[in-house]
Amino acid sequence: ARMNELTATYPDDAFFHEFTGDILFAMARPAEAAASYETALQLRPRSVLIQLNLGRSLIAEGRPASLERAIQVLAMARNAESQWGFLHRQYGIALGKAGRIVEADLALADEAIVINDKQRAAQLALRVLARDGVAESFRSRASDILFRYGG
């Protein structure tokens, strides 16, 4: 109730909306958390932390439209903070839940590269290359990973 008062009193303060999202997410209310994070993101569109938390809330919602929005938001965050392994993992989770397994494997390979787990990166790249019908751009990325980190 107190957070509702604060967001009503200070509607242009991204922190209060973000903190409301944090509380709602911790209370296992991902749809409401996502709404608070969306408001916070409108106020601070370049905040990687808000993008990450919005993405996590949308993943927890699990609806197809929520997953697509999570993928979009987490991709923006990844582009801004490419050396944050946790972002790559969350992006991979969103892709996997959306059924985009090849892309998920590549995102998880990127996480492995960032945290210096070369063996895992190579394993994930091999898994991509073992699939039939993989788009050439994904096959090329997997080959690059395997070449650099395959041992």
Question: Language-model segments: which ranges?
Answer:
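Canonical positions in the second alpha-helix
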Residues: 6, 39-40, 76-77, 111, ...
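Canonical tetratricopeptide repeat
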Residues: 19, 53-54, 90, 107, ...
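Structural motif corresponding to the intra-repeat A-B loop/turn of tetratricopeptide repeats
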Residues: 27, 61-64, 98-99, 115
